[in-house]
Amino acid sequence: MLNSNEKAYEYYRMINPIEHAKTREEAKKYKVEPYVISADIYGQGNLAGRGGWTWYTGSGSWMIVAGLKYILGLEIKDGYLSMNPHIPGFWKEYEIKYKYGEIIYNIQVARKKGQSTSFNSEVEMYCNNQRIEQNKIRLENNGKIYNINVIIQ
């Protein structure tokens, strides 16, 4: 997935169980729970499309990490919130509402008008309209609401 936003998103969707059970026919073919990560999906023969080996410990949590950190770009580390999005080219913007203790972070991420996104795109981060150096904010449980704007250059 490194160096390709589109590939990362494609692979994420490929293993996302809901993508295999959007219709009644797909769910009948998939045959496993549409809310649990499947370890494998048959690709050939009359079992093609069927899921197998569900309920692996940890796979759901890694799916969340992959989506939040490596695609949406949200990272919480050492008491800081940072954003480093790697979204596919057809996404123009998205929002995340993140709650930390009594704090609410309303995060809006948008591509600079006319910009495409490469894997190494630079971002600018603003908190309540103030530019944030190093694109990270210290998490403090002060009960405030913060409006974060992230602009993909």
Residue ranges of each PLM-predicted region?
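Non-catalytic C-terminal accessory modules of carbohydrate-active enzymes
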Residues: 1-153
